[in-house]
Amino acid sequence: MALIRKTFYFLFAVFFVLVQLPSECQAGLDFSQPFPSDEFAVCESCKLGRGKCRKECLENEKPDGNCRLNFLCCRERI
C-alpha cells in the first residue's frame, strides 16, 4: 500500500513540474530577440506586419499602438 502511495506522489510531482514548463505557444514573437539595428521582429498587434516594435519611433515614423511593455508599434508616415 505504501508503494502505491509513493508512486502516486511521485507521478503527481512530475505532473506538477511538467505543467509549470512554458508551452510552445509562448515561444513566439513576444520573446523575440532584437535585430542588430535595434529593431524587434514585427508584433501581431503591429498591424499585420506593417510596422516595427521599437522603444522610440524614427523621425519618418509615427507611433500606432503598443507592442508590449515600453515598446511602440512604429509605422512609416504617409
Swiss-Prot record:
<dbReference type="GO" id="GO:0005576">
    <property type="term" value="C:extracellular region"/>
</dbReference>
<keyword id="KW-0211">Defensin</keyword>
<dbReference type="InterPro" id="IPR025933">
    <property type="entry name" value="Beta_defensin_dom"/>
</dbReference>
<dbReference type="Pfam" id="PF13841">
    <property type="entry name" value="Defensin_beta_2"/>
</dbReference>
<dbReference type="GO" id="GO:0045087">
    <property type="term" value="P:innate immune response"/>
</dbReference>
<feature type="disulfide bond">
    <location>
        <begin position="57"/>
        <end position="73"/>
    </location>
</feature>
<dbReference type="GO" id="GO:0042742">
    <property type="term" value="P:defense response to bacterium"/>
</dbReference>
<keyword id="KW-0732">Signal</keyword>
<feature type="disulfide bond">
    <location>
        <begin position="53"/>
        <end position="67"/>
    </location>
</feature>
<comment type="similarity">
    <text>Belongs to the beta-defensin family.</text>
</comment>
<feature type="signal peptide">
    <location>
        <begin position="1"/>
        <end position="27"/>
    </location>
</feature>
<feature type="disulfide bond">
    <location>
        <begin position="43"/>
        <end position="74"/>
    </location>
</feature>
<keyword id="KW-0929">Antimicrobial</keyword>
<keyword id="KW-0044">Antibiotic</keyword>
<keyword id="KW-1015">Disulfide bond</keyword>
<comment type="function">
    <text>Has antimicrobial activity.</text>
</comment>
<protein>
    <recommendedName>
        <fullName>Beta-defensin 105A</fullName>
    </recommendedName>
</protein>
<keyword id="KW-0964">Secreted</keyword>
